[in-house]
């Protein structure tokens, strides 16, 4: 680089600085490259900037120094010679007198300090300059930042792994003195983070720290407790927690601070603010963790007294929280998440462990003192919860401490008693020692079964513990719900204790839970036992199957009227057993499979018994729910499991539907069982689908004894459900033949078919048109001239299959159906058929991880609604005949009934007048649909409701009265909407209708339905209280 080029570069940098910093930075990099390649020297840059340095213009002097510093910062640390470093150092030193350049000079020193050939003498001189000449109170935060950066760079260069050299010893004390000077009075959060970090580095690495420990501690603790609220749009993203953590880390960096830290923190512990108290406790916790046993030995008495006071005065939790055994499981190990109470316990835990590791004799003295102070609480049953929590916290330290705590504590309270109050206290307090055991030895898991744990004193009390809990659960009165619930919870927690219980003891607990859940009607006992069985099944699934599930399944009789008794208890209902099976087998692999297999076998026997329809329904519902609840969980039902289940239960199910049984003769049971057949095929390996399709076609269509296309057969619904589960890409040569045959069968026999038979064939049309038959072939079967009911139904169901796959032709077909709404003879019928287009079919929906079973698009309802809405609205507005108007409104309302509310939002302004008119339609279903949409509109469009409140309120009042078309649902939703209006419409509007609503609803108080009377009372109460100021 020539001198002219250098001058040009300097001019470019100066011109772009603070305007285009990227360009200025690029120019500085170019100059640095020339220095590195030795085409110019850094001193030449100084010469080139000479005129700017001497300028009377302050801005030019600043820019010139920034230019030099930027180039210097980019220069490699080992490039400048000793002489160059010395000259540059002296140059920056000469600029110190120029107060306007303070920030730029400090930046220059920060760039120079890491240079390899800057001598220790010059570093000492720099530190002395900062100590003597730098007055932090005269500068802004952005300038005060640089001394911290200078100190950090000096520290990183000389003190990291180098504090023993003689050279470094020369600046050790000077460095600390300079830091104390620079850090004094700092308030900027960014600078404080650097200050705290430097303080920690000094106390962790430098020598002679003990000579400065009071000053170093004071320059930290003056900020405690730190409070900082970051400003909006803070560019540094510094949080209050960042500062707290940094300060805490610095305070606990050296045991030299122990004496000052403990005394000052214990003073702060008396603060009334919970936030300050929490910060103090968390800092104390870190002090105990890091300062070690020797500092605790000197301070444990003070710490114990302060912590004991906090714990005894501020107990957290009560009986209700103890009744939830999962609270502790959900706690975080993050220090920042400790409550004040938990932090006190954790400090005591660490104090004990640190003392034990430091000096066992001192620990003995500490523990004896603590136990002597707490023993009276056991005698007088005072503060027992806090007492046991303190002792269990101490016991969580290590095995030896745990054994000492157990052997000293259990004899004081683990005494069997028949007194309810004492037994409750015993069980509640025992819980804390279970937590201590789990903290120390770990939690039981499938992987840890059989892994031994160290010998411990609690094991010696195991038989006594089990006996006490067993008696509390099985011998207590049914009215003693709390005692019995607590015993279930403690048994559940004991299951989690690694290596504590033998399989035989676990089996006994499973037996207790199973018997209690069967014989006790209290919901607390039920859910406690249920959660217990779920917890046990996560670890001991085989035992739960053998002892609990088998017993439950074996209790199911073949005859519905047969009485079921357990332990001579009163008759247990079949519904209760099936509900228990459903509730606790969820997501457990073996339990789900075995339940389905057994229940299918039981169903096969029960179905052959006359008058067993209700029992069959219960069994089929349970099987269906087990499939439906676990179908998408690969850990419970994978492809291999699905195939094994199919092979195990499908022959039994087909035996039921192909012979005379209580299921074939019951339409609802048959439909539900057909849905079970859908699930048995849904997740089997795809490679098996083609073979299964061929087999089912032979059975239902061609060679089997069912042959649903020959004459009407109720099993068409089973065939349709099975087809819904199979891969849409399977080869199905006779698909159109089946489709055509189904259409012909419907047209010929529909008048004589039962409703279930007809729906079975119609759903078969839907499945075929959606996933097997081409769009062209489906449309080819449409006969728009035939306006018979059955032909219209056939076309609607075929169209539904196309709509669900977002067929391009479906929009045009829908418009033809809209045209039929104006037909005086069939318009009313067609309007009701519009619901078919969007109603859900359970076997034709999307399942997670399964994309091959149908062509249903997720957003097909939204698309269909968008296709038909404007046409329906336009036709409605252009029609004079009220009957035809009613058809359009009915069609729209029934589509709205199944359309997601978020899809309706964009159309609400056009839709709202139609909703109000739909409320007068002579059809309860239309009214319900309109009310449901209006309910959603009220929730989301407050202004629109307010504008029309004068119309809405009288309408709703009329709909709340008994009337031919005001069904229970209509009346209930109308009352709910009246109540809802008061929450979204301004008070002054609502007050004008207060009297009208209160008087108009008086007759509704005598409605025949209790649910209507209750809602009416709630609605009237809301209007009665309008404008009143509630009492606090």
Curated annotation (Swiss-Prot):
Effect of mutating residue 335 to M: In strain: SK1
Keywords (A to Z) from UniProt: DNA damage, DNA repair, Nucleus, Repeat, Transcription
Changing residue 816 to M has the effect of: In strain: SK1
Question: Could you tell me which InterPro entries the record lists for this protein?
Answer: ARM-like, ARM-type_fold, MMS19, MMS19_C, MMS19_N
- The signal peptide, as residue positions, is none
What the entry lists under Pfam families is as follows: MMS19_C, MMS19_N
Domain of life the protein comes from: Eukaryota
Effect upon mutating residue 963 to Q: In strain: SK1
Can you say where the HEAT repeats lie in this chain? Answer: 862-901, 905-943, 946-988, 991-1029
Chief localization:
nucleus
Gene Ontology biological process: DNA repair; iron-sulfur cluster assembly; protein maturation
Cell location: Nucleus
Cellular component GO terms, alphabetical:
cytoplasm; cytosol; cytosolic [4Fe-4S] assembly targeting complex; nucleus
Say what the protein does.
Key component of the cytosolic iron-sulfur protein assembly (CIA) machinery that mediates the incorporation of iron-sulfur cluster into apoproteins specifically involved in DNA metabolism and genomic integrity. Acts as an adapter between early-acting CIA components and a subset of cellular target iron-sulfur proteins such as RAD3/XPD and DNA2, thereby playing a key role in nucleotide excision repair (NER) and RNA polymerase II (POL II) transcription.
Similarity remark: Belongs to the MET18/MMS19 family.
Q: What else is known?
A: Present with 3150 molecules/cell in log phase SD medium.
The protein, known as: DNA repair/transcription protein MET18/MMS19
Q: Which organism is it from?
A: Saccharomyces cerevisiae (strain ATCC 204508 / S288c) (Baker's yeast)
Lineage, opening ranks: Eukaryota, Fungi, Dikarya, Ascomycota, Saccharomycotina
């Amino acid at each position: 680089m020539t001198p002219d080029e250098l001058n040009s570069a300097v001019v470019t940098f100066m011109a772009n600085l603070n305007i285009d910093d990227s360009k200025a930075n690029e120019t500085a990099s170019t100059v640095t490259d020339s220095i590195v390649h030795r085409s110019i020297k850094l001193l030449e840059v100084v010469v080139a900037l000479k005129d700017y340095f001497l300028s009377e213009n302050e801005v030019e002097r600043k820019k010139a120094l920034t230019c030099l510093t930027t180039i210097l910062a980019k220069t490699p640390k080992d490039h400048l010679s000793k002489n160059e470093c010395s000259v540059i150092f002296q140059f920056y030193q000469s600029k110190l007198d120029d107060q306007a350049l303070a920030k730029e000079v400090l930046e220059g020193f920060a760039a120079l300090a890491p240079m390899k050939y800057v001598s220790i003498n010059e570093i000492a001189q720099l530190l002395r300059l900062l100590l003597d000449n730098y007055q932090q109170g005269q500068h802004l935060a952005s300038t005060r930042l640089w001394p911290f950066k200078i100190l950090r760079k000096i520290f990183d260069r000389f003190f990291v792994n180098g504090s023993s050299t003689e050279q470094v010893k020369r600046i050790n004390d000077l460095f600390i003195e300079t830091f104390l000077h620079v850090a004094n009075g700092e308030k900027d959060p960014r600078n404080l983070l650097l200050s705290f970090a430097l303080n920690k580095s000094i106390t962790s690495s430098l020598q002679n720290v003990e000579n400065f420990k009071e000053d170093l501690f004071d320059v930290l603790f003056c900020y405690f407790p730190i409070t900082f609220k970051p400003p909006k749009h803070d560019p540094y993203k510094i949080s209050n927690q960042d500062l707290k953590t940094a300060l805490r880390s610095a305070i606990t960096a050296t045991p030299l601070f122990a004496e000052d830290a403990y005394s000052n923190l214990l003073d702060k512990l008396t603060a009334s603010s919970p936030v300050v108290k929490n910060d103090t406790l968390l800092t104390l916790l870190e002090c105990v963790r890091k300062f070690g046993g020797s500092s605790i030995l000197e301070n444990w008495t003070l710490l114990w007294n302060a912590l004991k006071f906090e714990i005894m005065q501020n107990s957290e939790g009560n009986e209700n929280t103890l009744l939830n055994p999962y609270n502790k499981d959900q706690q975080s190990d993050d220090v920042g998440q400790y409550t004040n109470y938990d932090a006190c316990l954790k400090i005591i835990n660490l104090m004990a462990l640190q003392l034990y590791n430091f000096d066992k004799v001192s620990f003995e003295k500490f523990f004896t003192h603590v136990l002597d102070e707490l023993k009276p609480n056991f005698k007088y049953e005072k503060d027992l919860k806090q007492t046991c929590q303190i002792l269990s916290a101490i016991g969580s330290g290590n095995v030896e401490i745990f054994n000492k705590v157990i052997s000293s504590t259990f004899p004081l309270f683990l005494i069997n008693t028949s007194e309810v109050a004492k037994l409750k206290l015993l069980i509640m307090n025992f819980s804390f020692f279970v937590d201590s055991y789990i903290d120390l030895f770990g939690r039981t898991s499938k992987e840890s079964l059989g892994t031994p744990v160290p010998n411990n004193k609690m094991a010696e009390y195991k038989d006594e513990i089990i006996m006490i809990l067993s008696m509390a659960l099985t011998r207590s009165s049914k009215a003693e719900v709390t005692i019995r619930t607590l015993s279930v919870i403690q048994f559940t927690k004991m299951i989690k204790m690694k290596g504590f219980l033998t399989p035989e003891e676990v089996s006994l607990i499973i037996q207790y839970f199973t018997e209690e859940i069967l014989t006790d009607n209290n919901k607390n006992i039920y859910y406690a036992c249920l959660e217990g069985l779920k917890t046990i099944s996560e670890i001991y699934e085989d035992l739960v199957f053998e002892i609990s599930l088998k017993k439950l399944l074996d209790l199911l009789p073949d005859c519905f009227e047969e009485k079921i008794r357990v332990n001579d208890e009163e008759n247990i209902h079949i519904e209760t057993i099936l509900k228990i099976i459903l509730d606790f087998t969820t997501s457990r692999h073996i339990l789900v499979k075995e339940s389905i297999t057994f229940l299918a076998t039981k169903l096969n026997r029960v179905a052959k018994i006359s008058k067993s329809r209700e029992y069959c329904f219960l069994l089929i519902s349970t099987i269906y729910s087990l499939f439906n609840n676990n179908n998408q969980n690969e850990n419970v039902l994978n492809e291999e499991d699905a195939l094994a289940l199919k092979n195990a239960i499908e022959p039994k199910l087909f035996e039921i539907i192909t012979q005379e049984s209580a299921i074939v003769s019951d339409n609802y049971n048959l439909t539900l069982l057909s849905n079970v057949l859908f699930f048995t095929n849904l997740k089997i390996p795809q490679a098996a689908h083609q073979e299964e399709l061929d087999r089912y076609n032979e059975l239902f269509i061609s060679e089997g004894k069912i042959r649903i296309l020959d004459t009407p057969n109720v099993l068409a619904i089973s065939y349709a459900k099975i087809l819904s589960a199979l891969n849409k890409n399977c080869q199905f040569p006779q698909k159109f033949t089946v489709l055509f045959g189904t259409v012909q069968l419907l047209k010929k026999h529909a008048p004589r078919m039962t409703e279930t038979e007809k729906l079975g064939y119609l759903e078969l049309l839907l499945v075929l048109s959606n996933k097997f038959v081409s769009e062209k072939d489906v449309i080819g079967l449409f006969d728009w001239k035939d306006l018979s009911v059955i032909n219209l139904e056939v076309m609607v169901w075929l169209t539904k299959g196309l709509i669900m796959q977002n067929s391009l032709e479906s929009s045009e077909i829908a418009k033809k159906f809209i045209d039929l709404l104006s037909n005086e003879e069939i318009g009313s019928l067609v309007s009701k058929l519009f619901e078919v287009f969007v109603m859900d079919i359970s076997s034709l929906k999307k399942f997670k991880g399964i994309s091959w079973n149908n062509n249903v698009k997720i957003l097909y309802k939204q698309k269909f609604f968008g296709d038909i809405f404007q046409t329906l609205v336009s036709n409605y507005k252009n029609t004079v005949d009220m009957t035809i108007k009613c058809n359009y409104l009915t069609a729209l309302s029934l589509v709205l009934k199944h359309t997601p509310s978020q899809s309706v939002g964009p159309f609400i302004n056009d839709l709202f007048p139609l909703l109000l008119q739909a409320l007068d339609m002579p059809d309860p279903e239309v009214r319900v649909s309109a009310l449901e949409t209006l309910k959603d509109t009220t929730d989301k469009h407050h202004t629109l409701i307010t504008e029309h409140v004068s119309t809405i309120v009288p309408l709703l009042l009329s709909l709340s009265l008994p009337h031919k078309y005001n069904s229970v649902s209509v009346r209930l939703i109308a009352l709910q909407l009246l109540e809802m209006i008061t929450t979204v419409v301004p008070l002054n509007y609502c007050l004008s209708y207060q009297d009208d609503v209160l008087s108009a609803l008086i007759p509704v108080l005598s409605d025949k339905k209790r649910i209507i009377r209750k809602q009416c009372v709630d609605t009237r109460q809301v209007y009665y209280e309008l404008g009143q100021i509630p009492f606090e």
